[in-house]
UniProtKB/Swiss-Prot annotation:
Belongs to the UPF0173 family. HAMAP family: UPF0173. Coiled coil: none annotated. The keyword Hydrolase applies. InterPro entries: Metallo-B-lactamas, RibonucZ/Hydroxyglut_hydro, UPF0173, UPF0173_UPF0282_UlaG_hydrolase. It comes from Bacillus cereus (strain ZK / E33L). Keywords: Hydrolase. Gene3D superfamilies: Ribonuclease Z/Hydroxyacylglutathione hydrolase-like (3.60.15.10). It comes from the Bacteria. This is UPF0173 metal-dependent hydrolase BCE33L4354. One of its GO terms (molecular function) is hydrolase activity.
Amino acid sequence: MKVSYHGHSVVKIETNGKVILIDPFLTGNPKTDLKAEDVNVDAILLSHGHGDHVGDTVELAKKNNAVVVAPFELATFLSWQGVNTHPMHIGGSHEFDFGKVKFTQAFHGSSYIDEENKTITYTGMPAGILFTAEEKTLYHAGDTALFSDMKLIGELNNIDVAFLPIGDNFTMGPEDAVLAAKWVQAKTVVPMHYNTFPVIEQDPYQFVEKLQNCTGKVLEAGESITL
């Protein structure tokens, strides 16, 4: 399984001849190396409904006839826009032809904000994502605060790599993320959701230096690891 990072919370997985994107915020993302028009994808996994995570989902899904796996309310909202969706909910898992997906708890919000009409549409509960293929497991925490049940996620799953937000303000900051890394017990931890906007500026190298009992890895946009 090849896993690459593409800025903010965008993660690409290549496995079993399939390409999966998590939270494909490409257009308007100053930290990504990807352009939506150049991306080919078989499946899209969404953690929640905020614009910096849903991103280019509708365009990518329609262009590639890709399935969008998302929390139930968000999946329903996107299906009304003509997207092929597979709704799930926290605690549920499903075996797809590209791998197994399970949604975990996350402490955050989830909504679609229409700035022009000044409306906010509820899109369900936010989630973290466990993805398993080729006997390897990736944990994408989504946007979240630190929460004690991360210990349970670590106890129940043999996590090879975890992507954890460190930006603070909207999610946990570096200090809490260090504790999260300890609790989820991943072999490798990669920071995400930082430096996209001034309010979430952080030094990822300082973060990985503080990690214990795991390998910390800073990935620049386009860099990858192989599990």
